[in-house]
A protein has these predicted regions:
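Conserved, structured core segments of small domains
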Residues: 1-93
Length: 93
């Protein structure tokens, strides 16, 4: 399993009725992924239009597929960061 921090924000230049509908479907999409244990945490970014989600996936390809299925995929910019579990790292001597 690999964990990724995914920050996404909406491109306000693409504001439309279609974008508004996509945003309305994000909570349902997030709940579905949390139920499947593919998303461990979801946060709203205060003062902006977007979110911060932590994905726990089997591969880069699975992450790409889940991002592409997000309702806001065509309206958002993504910043994807791989995460490392610092407690799993060996201590240097």
């Amino acid at each position: 399993m690999a964990k990724f921090l995914v920050l996404w924000h909406l491109d306000q230049g693409l504001l439309s009725t279609e974008m508004a509908r996509a945003v309305q479907h994000m909570p349902e999409y997030g709940e579905k992924l949390q139920g499947q244990k593919k998303v461990t945490d979801r946060y709203h970014l205060v003062g902006g239009h977007g979110g911060c989600w932590i994905y726990d996936v089997d591969s880069n390809e699975e992450l790409e597929m889940l991002l592409a299925q997000a309702p806001v995929f065509n309206f958002a910019h993504y910043d994807v960061r791989p995460l490392a579990d610092m407690t799993a790292m060996p201590l240097s001597e």
